[in-house]
Amino acid sequence: MKGKSDVMRTLAFAGGDKYVGEWSDGKENGHGTYAFVGGDKYVGDWRDSKRNGRGTQTYSDGGSYVGEWRDDKKHGRGTQTYSDGSSYAGEFRNDKRNGQGTLRWANGDKYVGEWRDNKENGQGTYVFADGDKYVGEVSDRKRNGRGTETYSDGREYVGEWTDGKRNGQGTLSRPNGQNYVGEFKDDLQSGQGTITWPNGQKYVGEFEDDKPNGQGTYSFPGGAKYVGEVKDGFYDGQGIYTSTEGWTQSGLWNRGKFVKADSSPGGNAHQ
């Protein structure tokens, strides 16, 4: 049943806005076009003088929204394009990106996943223009929680993230067969960890700034071993090297070279 005075109306408002469309019960009801004085424009469904249903809004900055509305807010499914060239397709709630959706940036990056209050939050996938890809937990537009990133150079990281960086426990695999398992800090190998090489060599110990630093143990396929202090990956400081033949060098090392034997008897048993 039609409402009272269900007619087409053209209304010009004191502030400069203009409405052309269906009118009933003294309100915008039905289908109509509303031109805002600032340059925005809405074409679509109305109920009780508010945008309700499906409609298209174009903005003065060149952006647009096509989709569902409730009480003058984007609510439901829709597609929004922005003046910077990016676009979002998915769910909205109370005028914000909420739920499942896909955002494509002008530079070619893409995010597919969960949203909360206009931010990437929950489970999602980032696909970057440079070929990198992240799948995992996201909060406040950053990789946070557990996730897997595959890099364009063939590396893969599986583990914990904080504020978009590798932080916590994780595994970094390289295409040459080298693998690191252990702690990370601000994208770098830092803390306790283990590196294995494809030739069977292994290092277990402390890391800092992406390199073995501190106390650690190198072991080699033939049975040789170094136990002691390391710096930037080199034997450096006090340490004991045991060869495959069984002889040892115990003492001070510098940049991988043995420089001084222990003063105690038997400190250097190299024969």
Functional labels for PLM-detected ranges:
Residues 1-4, 14, 264-265:
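N-terminal leader/linker segments that initiate helical-solenoid repeat arrays
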Residues 1-5, 18-29, 41-52, 65-75, ...:
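Conserved anchor residues at repeat-unit boundaries in beta-strand-based tandem repeats, strongest
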Residues 5-6, 270:
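Acidic, proline/serine/threonine- and glycine-rich low-complexity intrinsically disordered segments
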Residues 6-7, 106, 127, 156:
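Acidic, Ala/Val/Gly-enriched low-complexity intrinsically disordered segments
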Residues 10, 24-29, 33, 50, ...:
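Threonine-centered tandem repeat motifs in low-complexity domains
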Residues 13, 34-36, 59, 82, ...:
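Aromatic (phenylalanine/tyrosine) cluster motif
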Residues 257-271:
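Terminal, low-structured helical/coil segments at or just beyond the last alpha-helical repeat
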